[in-house]
From Swiss-Prot:
Subcellular location, record wording: Cytoplasm
Keywords of the record: Aminoacyl-tRNA synthetase, ATP-binding, Cytoplasm, Ligase, Nucleotide-binding, Protein biosynthesis
Full protein name: Histidine--tRNA ligase
Enzyme class (EC, first level): ligase
Entry's family note: Belongs to the class-II aminoacyl-tRNA synthetase family.
Catalysis performed (reactions): tRNA(His) + L-histidine + ATP = L-histidyl-tRNA(His) + AMP + diphosphate + H(+)
Entry-linked Pfam families: HGTP_anticodon (PF03129), tRNA-synt_His (PF13393)
Gene Ontology cellular component list: cytoplasm
Length: 423
């Protein structure tokens, strides 16, 4: 026997026993996004490596340690499996000139790839739903996105288990002034910094504030705050955003250490977090990235978006027992005898045309075995077709869930009979 080949560590199969849960979540998401005017965009899972270096940032953890990068054997180009969805979406927007004299509200979903240590809620291949709102400069779109995510939690039934954290990263000049003060502060506490903090001190000092090291928490909490370096325009944007969030009744916590792990963010940033899943508590995160289109080779344009880890939301839904059971078929057709397979197949098609879901038994099996499979399928009824039913142009209807008696129904009446029983 050949050696069994298994899935790559951190890249998981989604099996039929759970795929219906994904379909449910995706269905809620699609309905929500349509309600807010978003259109679907689909981009390749492989992009040119410079796209991510230029957008995410060369000294970020993603680019330095987590990307799946390889060389194209045909032309020597460096290619990367996408670690996130924003860069590829904006590449497509710029390439196809989708912002010419208009704005765009786009959404995407699909697998992303990061080479990191697998753990609960964090995988090397993970699935993300993301949105990008492009061409909107004011804080109103920032607020609408918060409202939309809050609406999603309400539709899923998890509003009580997530909390919104917000911050502002200001503009480029304000971040530069804060960066200078932050480096000076960190240099005075270099003895407290761990190796990761020392590595980031001069390359990406803002990320030092995002440390999870308990020994660095007091130092990080006392560090200069970016909000204290905001100019009038950035402060007005932030205050306007907060006022709109408050006006629609959404509670939030200001977190001055919320900086996000990608270099393209500026102004508004946010995370929806939960304490129900242990250490990895972020279920949705995003922010504004004005100017990212210019970095990718397009004209400057304001933009904001978020990414949501689908596995983490599903873990939370499962933890709260909020995922639906698998929807069973309405009918399982049991057939036996000469002419029964064709008769059953025609019957199944008539029922499907009327909107019922039908499983027809295929192949040879005893009546007892077929009835056992019908019961295991979860179907509401077993329809029994044998030589006698074919001669009489009838169907035997056996309820499987409510204990009522079996009935014989004329073939011409079976659709209306079952429709009446389902009403």
């Amino acid at each position: 026997m050949a050696e069994k080949i298994q899935a790559i560590r951190g890249m998981n199969d989604i099996l039929p026993a759970e795929s219906h849960q994904w379909e449910y979540f995706e269905g809620v998401l699609r309905g929500l996004l349509a309600d807010y005017g978003y259109q679907n965009i689909r981009t390749p899972i492989v992009e040119s490596t410079p796209l991510f270096i230029r957008s995410i940032g060369e000294v970020t953890d993603i680019v330095e340690k987590e990307m799946y990068t390889f060389t194209d054997s045909l032309n020597g180009d460096s290619l990367t499996l996408r670690p996130e969805g924003t860069a590829g979406t904006l590449r497509a927007v710029v390439e196809h000139n989708l912002l010419y004299n208009t704005t765009q509200k786009l959404w995407y979903t699909g697998p992303m790839f990061r080479h990191e240590r697998p753990q609960k809620g964090r995988y090397r291949q993970f699935h993300q739903i993301g949105i990008e709102a492009l061409g909107f400069a004011g804080p109103d779109i920032d607020a609408e996105i918060i409202l939309m995510t809050a609406d999603l939690w309400k539709r899923l039934g998890i509003s009580d288990f997530v909390q919104l954290e917000i911050n502002t990263l200001g503009n480029k000049e304000e971040r530069a002034a804060h960066r200078e003060a932050l480096i000076k502060y960190l240099e005075g506490h270099v003895d407290i910094l761990d190796e990761d903090g020392k590595r980031r001190l001069y390359t990406n000092p803002l990320r030092v504030l995002d440390t999870k090291n308990p020994a660095m928490q007091d130092m990080a909490n006392q560090a200069p705050r970016l909000i204290d370096y905001l100019g009038a325009e950035s402060r007005a944007h932030y205050d306007g955003w907060k006022a709109m969030i408050e006006a629609v009744g959404i509670r939030y916590v200001e977190n001055p250490r919320l900086v996000r792990g990608l270099d393209y963010y500026n102004q508004s940033v946010f995370e929806w977090v939960t304490t129900e899943l242990g250490a990895q508590g972020t279920v949705c995160a995003g922010g504004r990235y004005d100017g990212l289109t210019e970095q990718i080779g397009g004209k400057p344009a304001p933009g904001i978006g978020f990414g949501m880890g689908m596995e983490r939301v599903l873990l939370l839904l499962a933890d709260k027992d909020l995922l639906p059971a698998r929807k069973a078929a309405d009918v399982y057709i049991v057939q036996q005898g000469e002419g029964a397979p064709v008769y059953a197949m025609q019957l199944a098609q008539d029922l499907r045309a009327a909107g019922l879901s039908v499983i027809q038994h295929l192949g040879e099996a005893s009546f007892k075995s077929q009835m056992k499979k019908a019961d295991q399928s979860g179907a509401r009824w077993a329809l029994v077709v044998g030589e006698n039913e074919i001669r009489q142009q009838q169907v035997a209807v056996k309820p499987l869930r409510d204990g009522t008696e079996q009935q014989t129904v004329a073939r011409t009446d079976i659709v209306s009979h079952l429709a009446g029983r389902m009403a």
